[in-house]
């Protein structure tokens, strides 16, 4: 199929010949009476070309209300959810990459307790991708090199804000997917949040973006070498984009999974 968005409509025809193409929903909140609402019976299907790196296992530590593991698995990423036992005693070297969901450092005590094992995994050649975290992450010193967050935190609320690639030749924007202007289209709600504000020179910023009238921000995607491995901190709102089926976000995330030293 040609890449794009397609609307599929459903309808049912009864024995008496009457046709129904609506879906019945109920609006029900404590402060109002339940009220039925009929919407068209439609579903949007998005077709995109997403190339995945050769992966056999990707570990994932889920954050609160995090639907990314299911979204990644739906396009073929071999996801293993990492619980307390895996973080404390599991063989992390079996994973080509380990992804930390947004705010997981606030809700997963085993991640906090075993952060040293995660950094050892990176130093031994692993790839760690940490998605947006809040102030406890900074206060705990969980990153391998110093980072800071502003108060209030740096974010880009305009989902259509222009994005500048700081090093267009870097493999992050070419392997396995060629990232271009179209990949920044169709994002939902925001570009990202809890961007790093200051960082150690060991990190390299890969993107620049900002809301209209605000100064440029470069802390949305930082990459650092840690021993023989790679450590990524990103505030990009993948937790919104992947469940929403945004093709460019999938393609960029696939490229993050392909990062190597």
Give short role names for the model-derived ranges.
Residues 10-18:
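Enriched for extracellular/lumenal, surface-exposed ectodomains of secreted and cell-surface proteins
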Residues 1-8:
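Short glycine/proline/serine/threonine-rich loop/turn segments at secondary-structure transition edges
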Residues 103-185, 248:
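A glycine-rich, often tryptophan-bearing local segment used as a flexible ligand/cofactor-contacting loop or short
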Residues 148-246:
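Catalytic beta-strand/loop cores that center a nucleophilic Ser/Cys/Thr
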Residues 19-101, 132-134, 155-156, 240, ...:
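Aromatic-Pro/Gly-enriched surface loop or interdomain linker
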Residues 42-43, 84-87, 113-116, 215-221:
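Alpha-helical scaffolding within the catalytic cores
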């Amino acid at each position: 199929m040609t890449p794009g968005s397609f609307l599929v409509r459903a309808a049912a025809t009864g024995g008496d010949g009457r046709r129904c193409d609506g879906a019945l929903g109920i609006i029900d909140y404590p402060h109002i009476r339940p009220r039925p609402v009929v919407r068209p019976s439609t579903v949007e299907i998005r077709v995109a070309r997403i190339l995945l790196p050769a992966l056999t296992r990707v570990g994932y530590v889920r954050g609160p209300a995090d639907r990314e593991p299911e979204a990644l698995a739906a396009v073929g990423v071999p996801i293993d959810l990492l619980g307390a036992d895996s973080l404390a005693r599991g063989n992390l070297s079996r994973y080509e990459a380990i992804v930390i969901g947004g705010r997981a450092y606030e809700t997963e005590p085993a991640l906090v307790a075993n952060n040293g094992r995660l950094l050892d995994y990176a130093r031994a050649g692993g790839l760690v991708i940490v998605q947006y975290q809040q102030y406890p992450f900074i206060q705990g010193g969980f990153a391998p090199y110093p980072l800071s967050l502003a108060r209030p935190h740096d974010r880009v609320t305009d989902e259509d804000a222009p994005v500048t690639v700081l090093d267009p030749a870097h493999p992050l924007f070419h392997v396995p997917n060629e990232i271009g202007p179209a990949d920044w289209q169709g994002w939902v709600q925001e570009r990202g949040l809890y961007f790093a504000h200051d960082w150690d020179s060991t990190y390299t910023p890969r993107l620049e973006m900002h809301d209209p009238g605000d100064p440029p921000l470069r802390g949305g995607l930082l990459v650092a070498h840690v021993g023989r491995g790679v450590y990524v901190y990103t505030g990009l709102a993948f937790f919104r984009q992947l469940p929403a089926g945004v093709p460019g976000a999938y393609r960029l995330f696939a490229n993050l999974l392909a990062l190597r030293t």
